[in-house]
């Protein structure tokens, strides 16, 4: 029996069958995820096809279950960034003029300078409580350390966000008040 479009049958090491979905857009092969059944994988493929063939210019905030029934939100962001800006980035980044947004979820958005694009396009950001980190060579690296904020620093005492937005990590928005490095 022939697979549905965009769907490939695969097998786990323990013998369980699962279905991978992918699409090719602008000569780029894009994985859409793994699914338990062929219909869900095909639905994700159909969602992605509808997005890239649509005349609409979608933005990340336009995500809804009526547009994407099976496609993950993070994959939505990657696809519309590729469609609108011409650059495919596997992490959920949407490029803006002189900065970019990194989407941890639809309502959890981080802002960075374009200078950090290369780093965050290759590192997935994770959140545990208020702790934001990337996995780097088996370690959890706090993203605040990239901006001179020490792990023991206290907000509004040792550093502050100039515009008050704790999710805005643009260099101009971070002011180090106490650059204490330890006793020398």
Question: Where do the protein language model's features map onto the residues?
Answer:
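An aromatic-rich alpha-helical recognition segment common to small helix-rich domains
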Residues: 21, 41-49, 184
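Basic K/R-rich, polyanion-interacting modules in nucleoproteins and related proteins
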Residues: 1-16, 50, 61-183
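A short, exposed loop/beta-hairpin motif centered on an aromatic-Gly-Thr core
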Residues: 28-39
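Short acidic/polar inter-strand loop motif in beta-rich domains
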Residues: 53-56
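A broad, structure-centric signal for solvent-exposed, well-ordered loop/edge residues
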Residues: 14, 39-42
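Positively charged, aromatic-enriched nucleic acid-contacting surfaces
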Residues: 17-25, 30, 184
